[in-house]
């Protein structure tokens, strides 16, 4: 009897047959097997900043720091779900249909593909979140957030 998980495995071409030694362990950049978040925060300093921590053919892991009141542009993804681990501060996710999620350190937020989302740091301290996505992580940008009064200039063709 096949499961949906077997179907997923059949779609992945890079499957190993048994235990192997780690294939990557870069000293810097994506490919590090052990990432010390405190060291990144100390090196990067005050928000805003991002640090790409994990990148391979199936995974993108990005550490994101935002200043109080700061947010990203509303967007959605057509081919992957996105999720975050809140590591510091308070964040607000504003979603399609008027749904709002408030999250704090220790929370995990998962947003299904197709859902417009816009993330804002609440309170008076920097927020820190670890975002997990699937490459190439294409963003479909929106000109406004339907839940708040934030608007952005329309994207100009490159």
Question: What do these predicted ranges mean?
Answer:
Residues 64, 83, 106-107, 117-119:
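Hydrophobic/aromatic beta-strand elements that line small-molecule binding cavities or substrate pockets
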Residues 57-59, 80, 126:
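Short acidic/glycine-enriched loop/turn segments that link adjacent beta-strands
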Residues 64-67, 76-93, 133-135:
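Short, conserved beta-strand element in jelly-roll/cupin
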Residues 1-60, 73-74, 144-158:
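A short, N-terminal "cap"/entry segment at the start of jelly-roll beta-barrel domains
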Residues 68-70, 79, 99, 115-116, ...:
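A generic "binding-loop/recognition-motif" signal
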Residues 51-55, 63-64, 72-78, 95, ...:
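Short histidine-centered beta-strand/loop micro-motifs
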Residues 92, 105, 113-140:
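Ligand-binding loop in jelly-roll beta-barrel domains
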Residues 97-113:
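Short acidic-glycine-tyrosine-enriched beta hairpin
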């Amino acid at each position: 009897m096949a499961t949906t998980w077997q179907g997923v495995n059949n779609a992945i071409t890079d499957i190993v047959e048994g235990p192997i030694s780690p294939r990557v362990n870069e000293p810097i950049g994506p490919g590090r097997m052990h990432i010390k978040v405190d060291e990144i925060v100390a090196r990067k300093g005050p928000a805003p900043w991002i640090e790409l921590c994990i990148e391979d053919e199936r995974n993108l892991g990005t550490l994101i720091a935002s200043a109080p009141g700061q947010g990203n542009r509303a967007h959605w993804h057509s081919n992957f779900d996105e999720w975050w681990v809140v590591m510091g501060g308070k964040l607000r996710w504003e979603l399609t249909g008027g749904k709002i999620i408030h999250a704090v350190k220790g929370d995990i937020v998962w947003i299904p593909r197709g859902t417009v989302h816009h993330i804002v740091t609440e309170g008076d301290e920097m927020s820190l979140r670890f975002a997990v996505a699937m490459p190439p992580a294409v963003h479909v940008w929106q000109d406004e957030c339907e839940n708040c009064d934030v608007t952005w200039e329309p994207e100009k063709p490159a």
